[in-house]
Amino acid sequence: MSELPELTPDLESGEEGFLIKPEFKPKAIRSFVIRAGRITVGQKNAFDTWWPVFGLGLFKGMINPEQVFGRKAPLVLEIGFGMGDSLLEMARNEPDKNFIGIEVHPPGVGRLINVAGQENLTNLRVYMADAMDVLEDCIPDGAIDRLQLY
């Protein structure tokens, strides 16, 4: 999958935790507003353990969904999954489909991959990046069967 995102100890707040940033290409206009990127020790552990399994990297280039998931199945792409509740529920209830989520909020990504790993969901992957960059550089034309935008 992808390399672990850069985690920096949060030394400014005085609280135990880490700072993490989504991937994005340099540009003036973004499709999102970066919310606080502070994650807890538990979320950092989720990234350490599960990002190599579920994480997809923006700068890895165009993906082949069949290779990413190890099978051919309809692909659902969800942009802006927040804390991941609905995406997790769909991945659980539709094991015949592959799901890719895109989110820039690190705590939500950490929670999603932690639960997905604990439940051994094999039909779920995630980008922590700008959706416009992912759509332009990573997802092949015609690969998406269903797009969900929040």
Where does each model-flagged region fall?
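Redox-cofactor binding/interface segments in oxidoreductases and associated redox assembly factors
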Residues: 149
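SAM cofactor-binding core of SAM-dependent methyltransferases
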Residues: 65, 71-136
